[in-house]
């Protein structure tokens, strides 16, 4: 049907790749592809674009039919497919821990404590150089134990072992031997010798994910004698079932405890409200479940500022989605590309970049003759929401 940022592409909807009308649901293409986010790599004088401009579309298929899909790709694109090599590197946490023990004979207990000071940002461990700038206690320890920190910086990122990507398939426009070196794995299957980043420069990466939930839906539709596309997503019986939900088992994502509890409070009556339940079932957003439920059940709206009512009104004054953050920045005067970049920078909390963008917001407020309070609220929402807001698509 459509899941992830690819659902923000109207072209994919028209092609039938997704069944989500991005215009109807107010989704942003810039959340899928953004010029500003693209990385540039120069090799032998030729500039290659990597990352954001390359479409990343995950495909969820029946768990028990995934091999069938892979076999189809191999046959349809004979000589043009391969699995993708992964290179697992030494993380900052690991090198700090091991260097401390070997270089300065620190205890396991102390190094466990020190490595725990390095935070995660968007699920990824922060680089130790960034942690040095951002975490005062970690900086203080590194200044006292400079040999450990210096050596850890030298070996971080080195390859420790290699593997195979669990879901990705490489697809070439021509015979794949022309675009990357290949090797065989232990099962005699073809794998790219390049890692994922290099392989994607010259080929397309497809993520084919086998989900048991898709298999359950497939079997249920076969038993009933319908297709998924036959289901009316606005039918009141769907939401009546969610309203009276007693057992969430088997309902994709809602079966998780946090989502189930949010669902019982919100009592969704539309696809938009059901989507909001999933967005609320995240660590930071759980604090807003009662506010949103009060909005859906009692029509109580808690505005943060009239300037943003048209953006946050549909979610009861709660900034649930990354697209809402982008809209707020856009309304202040930024382009949607800039708004996406701003969202990412605030989430990563890079001090130098944060200061720069704070000034840019102040400048936009003055340039467009807006109240200073509007800029303050925008920044506060960005800071509060960056770590929990959900991709609406």
Which residue stretches match the model-derived regions?
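Alpha-helical scaffold/interaction cores of sigma-54-like transcription cofactors
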Residues: 1-393
